Amino acid sequence: MSFDIQIATSYSQVKAQDWDALVTDSPLLCHAFLSALEETKCVGEGTGWQPYPILVYELGKLVGAAPLYLKVHSYGEYVFDWSWAEAYERSGLNYYPKLLVAIPFTPITGARLISNKPDVQAMIIRTMELQMQQYDLSSAHVLFTDESSSEALKVSNWLRRDGVQFRWHNDHFSDFDDFLSHLSHDKRKKIKQERKKVTNAGVICKRIKGADIRPQDWDFFYECYTNTYLEHRSTPYLTRSFFDEIGTSMPKNILLIIAELDGRSIAASLNIYGQQSLYGRYWGALEYVPNLHFELCYYQAQEFCIAENIKYFEGGAQGEHKLARGFLPRPTFSYHKIANPDFDKAINEFAHREASGMVAYYNELEERAPFKIN
């Protein structure tokens, strides 16, 4: 069977229904999300993210794809390779540009070599390797891979890096109190105290699904979102128009939570969800209320998952405090191909040392699990 492998320069060059047929129930990987990033200039010319999606057709049908980008920096990736770039620079070599398969600004595990056919996944990998050779690129990277993509990259002898994120599992809880009943006494008590303090402060939280989000709600959320970046003295990755775009194109996948105090909005969090998983993505506050972050980013979302029968709440990277809120650690993987043999050897040695430390860290987190021991 013959395949036609194409490298597009825009998501407008692939039909949304064809792309989405490959990524069922993956809202952060759907055509609407990826094209919104491009259409609202979060990626593209001048951003350091140039989209080059790989498309594999068989008899005219899209049977494989990968969200490939050409990168000229390492911002917005969440698998950190700055030290590699610095080592290249010290040696008089260019680390950038590099190839990257990822969802921009989104550290979420999922399909990256998007196909259920191993031979098609192998073609995508080989296409990236050929692009590295043809354009004399330093490296290629595939971030936050699911099991299928990980296996294909392992078979192709790509270097693996390990990480840890936190996930909450909705174990058929009937309500939030049912969830709390499964926690150890001290964790249950702490959560109740935190929620009570927020309530006693007079805060009211409103959960708004995508179709009901008004322009003024988006305006307020974006003010909160940008304020978070300003507090960390950095620049927001996403434009205001991006949120308008996803609000219009994928409203069934969006949950906005706004906190109000004395009739005024003071904080907001944005979640994106599918049938099986909810992803906590962005948060910001214009006024400080103790424990409001936990209420808005964790407890409200957990209640929503229980009410909507959503199985997983992906809490993302960092934040060991998530353990005390019912989250458990889960491993993450990324895969890397380094063209220079000397750097390939050195980075392999680095990754093996890093992996040993990550195993110890993961085991430590598991020992601190918040649930009752039967």
Regions found by a protein language model. Give the residues of each.
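N-acyltransferase acceptor-side catalytic subdomain
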Residues: 1-374
